[in-house]
């Protein structure tokens, strides 16, 4: 009986060891490169913008909040290296995250915060954290640490938001604009 048990033991051991190599061989594609993932975050941002746009007076912020400028000069953008795009997107995403957190703090200090507004703020915070993690896979954070040419790195253009509607509009436009352009190009090139 000793002879038949050896092949069974070897088969069992090989079956146990095979899955150790599977994560490397069958790694899931980078999630940020799946357009449906980014579209989900864009949809959430657009919903938040629509909810706050519905209020005629709109929930106002008690102080102005600095947000990234979302305008894109497509000619200049296409001429930028992907590393430069990464720096601009990472800086914009960081500033947007700070702005949403600041808005959350201002909302918490208001007398009667609307529940739906708080829900969208929470979703935005969660979405920005997820997007930040997904961008790390593309190496956007590494580019921020060592920009291609620090002397030519232009300062991030900003503007101010005084209402939640404007804040969520900037959030939505940033995701649909610079973030989508950068991830599309980085995924096409296979950059990490």
Curated annotation (Swiss-Prot):
Pfam families: EPO_TPO. The keyword Signal applies. Keywords: Disulfide bond, Erythrocyte maturation, Glycoprotein, Hormone, Secreted, Signal. GO terms for molecular function: cytokine activity; erythropoietin receptor binding; hormone activity; protein kinase activator activity. Disulfide bonds join 33-187. One of its GO terms (cellular component) is cell body. It is found in: Secreted. It comes from the Eukaryota. Residues 1-26 form the signal peptide. Produced by kidney or liver of adult mammals and by liver of fetal or neonatal mammals. InterPro entries: 4_helix_cytokine-like_core, EPO/TPO_CS, EPO_TPO, Erythroptn. Glycans are attached at residues 50, 64, 109. One of its GO terms (biological process) is erythrocyte maturation. Gene3D superfamilies: 1.20.1250.10. Hormone involved in the regulation of erythrocyte proliferation and differentiation and the maintenance of a physiological level of circulating erythrocyte mass. Binds to EPOR leading to EPOR dimerization and JAK2 activation thereby activating specific downstream effectors, including STAT1 and STAT3. PANTHER family: ERYTHROPOIETIN. Belongs to the EPO/TPO family. This is Erythropoietin. It comes from Rattus norvegicus (Rat). The gene is Epo.
């Amino acid at each position: 009986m000793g002879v038949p048990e050896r092949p069974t033991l070897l088969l069992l051991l090989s079956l146990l060891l095979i899955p150790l190599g599977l994560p490397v061989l069958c790694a899931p594609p980078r999630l940020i490169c799946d357009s449906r993932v980014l579209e989900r975050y864009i949809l959430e941002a657009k919903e938040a913008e629509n909810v706050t746009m519905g209020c005629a007076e709109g929930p106002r912020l008690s102080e102005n909040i600095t947000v990234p400028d979302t305008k894109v000069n497509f000619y200049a953008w296409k001429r930028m290296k992907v590393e430069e795009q990464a720096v601009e997107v990472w800086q914009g995403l960081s500033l947007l995250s700070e702005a949403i957190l600041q808005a959350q703090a201002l909302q918490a200090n208001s007398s009667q915060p609307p529940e739906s507004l708080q829900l969208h703020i929470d979703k935005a915070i969660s979405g920005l954290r997820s997007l930040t993690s997904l961008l790390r896979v593309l190496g956007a954070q590494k580019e921020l640490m060592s920009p291609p040419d620090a002397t030519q790195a232009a300062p991030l253009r900003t503007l101010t938001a005084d209402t939640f509607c404007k804040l969520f509009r900037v959030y939505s436009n940033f995701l649909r604009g610079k973030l989508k352009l950068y991830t599309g190009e980085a995924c096409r090139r296979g950059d990490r």
